[in-house]
Swiss-Prot record:
SUPFAM superfamilies: Phosphoglycerate kinase (SSF53748). Pathway: Carbohydrate degradation; glycolysis; pyruvate from D-glyceraldehyde 3-phosphate: step 2/5. It comes from Oceanobacillus iheyensis (strain DSM 14371 / CIP 107618 / JCM 11309 / KCTC 3954 / HTE831). The gene is pgk. One of its GO terms (biological process) is gluconeogenesis. It catalyses: (2R)-3-phosphoglycerate + ATP = (2R)-3-phospho-glyceroyl phosphate + ADP. This is Phosphoglycerate kinase. The keyword Nucleotide-binding applies. InterPro entries: Phosphoglycerate_kinase (IPR001576), Phosphoglycerate_kinase_N (IPR015824), Phosphoglycerate_kinase_sf (IPR036043). ATP binds at K201, E323, G349, G350, D351, S352. Monomer. Substrate binds at D21, F22, N23, R36, H59, L60, G61, R62, R118, R151.
Length: 393
């Protein structure tokens, strides 16, 4: 990675404004999954061990520039205190007198968490006044929030332009895993793209077709491709306006010598529910009033065998409606294939990360990305503003 990292900074006695991604799921004020907090620990622990005064900033949810009591970061501060084994101070303001006072009292190795940065309308607008307030709090800037790296906000890009700015350990790990995969892949290189809609994955599919040996398609978006092949798909998800594009992608794959792999059978249901009647049918035999909600058993075997023969696999998007157990089998089969492959497995955040967590397979993967939108944009070949704003080595 050609950006400065925390290893390039002298942090002892310095105030370090550290953008983290603590956007964790909450239920009744309790954190239900602390993965993102744990992911930031290596950076926080290195900074505190080296005697920095660590000022942590994060968003939580979408308060849209106003104070939403349920989205305060107090539960996060409590959980972080437990994980670090030391007190984490927390302010009720994002900036202002209370924050200035807390920072002035912070000791070397101390940790302070400021309030949810999205309580300020200026955060998402990258407002110069808020940027100035953040910059005045600190001597150095560290971005460890890969999950927010695709946002050009005050705490991700604005302040990075005002202070010496470096990547944290998680940011570095994410960029190296995804960057090496896309720039210098071991082959055979397989990408699996799932999810509901073609329109959300157009740029990803287009960019990956220039890089991969196998492109496996699953999830709702597969049925627009099946339709483009001339098959009837019943009531399955269809984007009429993307049929021509689907044909273009299949032609591009042919020209590039990419093995473009679509489902050969599907689990169809007579209703979108857990209680629906279901059956497995070949892909060209979907009944007119049924819809396909998961890949079938032959498809699972086919996809699994391609994964097992690959040296590198990137996966983004589920194979079916995995939130309903009746239609989770395809996603689970792919997750199990990735867990058991000898090749390097990368899970591209979002629903795929949620799926491998659900099936208890996250530990078996080589890299599970913490950023859904950010990893998607990185896979599209886009420049991430939060990364671009950091100092070059």
């Amino acid at each position: 990675m050609n950006k400065k990292t925390i290893n390039d900074l002298q942090v002892e006695g310095k105030r370090v404004f550290t953008r983290v991604d603590f956007n964790v799921p909450l239920k009744d004020g309790e954190i239900t999954d602390d993965t993102r907090i744990r992911a930031a620990l290596p950076t926080i622990e290195q900074l505190t061990a080296q005697g920095a005064k660590v000022i942590l900033a994060s968003h939580l949810g979408r308060p849209k520039g106003t104070v939403v009591e349920e989205l305060r970061l107090d539960p996060v501060a409590d959980r972080l205190s437990d994980l670090l084994g030391k007190e984490v101070l927390k302010t009720d303001q994002v900036y202002g007198e209370e924050v200035d006072q807390a920072i002035s009292e912070l000791e070397n190795g101390g940790v302070l968490l400021i309030e949810n940065v999205r309580f300020e309308a200026g955060e998402e607008k990258n407002d110069p006044e808020l940027v100035e307030a953040f910059a005045n709090m600190a001597d150095l800037y560290v971005n460890d929030a890969f999950g927010a790296a695709h946002r050009a906000h005050a705490s991700t890009t604005g302040v990075a332009e005002k202070l010496p700015a470096a990547a944290g350990k998680l940011m570095e790990k994410e960029i190296e895993a995804l960057g090496n995969a896309l720039e210098n892949p071991e082959r055979p290189f397989t990408a699996i793209v799932g999810g509901a809609k073609v329109k959300d994955k157009i740029s990803v599919i287009d960019n990956l077709l220039d890089k991969v040996d196998n492109l496996i398609i699953g999830g709702g978006l597969a049925y627009t491709f099946i339709k483009a092949q001339g098959h009837e798909i019943g009531k399955s998800l269809l984007e009429e306006d993307k049929i021509d594009l689907a044909k273009e992608f299949m032609n591009k794959a042919k020209e590039k010598g990419v093995n473009f792999v679509l489902p050969v059978d599907a689990i169809v249901a007579d209703d979108f529910s857990e209680e629906a009647n279901t059956k497995i049918v070949d892909i060209d035999k979907i009944p007119s009033d049924w819809e396909a909600l998961d890949i079938g058993t032959k498809t699972r075997e086919k996809y699994s065998s391609i994964v097992k023969d690959s040296k590198l696999v990137i996966w983004n998007g589920p194979m079916g409606v995995f939130e309903l157990n009746a239609f989770a089998g395809g996603t689970k089969a792919v997750a199990e294939a990735l867990a058991s492959t000898e090749g390097y497995s990368i899970i591209g955040g979002g629903d795929s990360a949620a799926a491998v967590e659900k099936f208890g397979l996250a530990e078996e993967m080589d890299h599970v990305s913490t950023g859904g939108g950010a990893s998607l944009e990185f896979m599209e070949g886009k420049v991430l503003p939060g990364l671009a704003a950091l100092n070059d080595k």
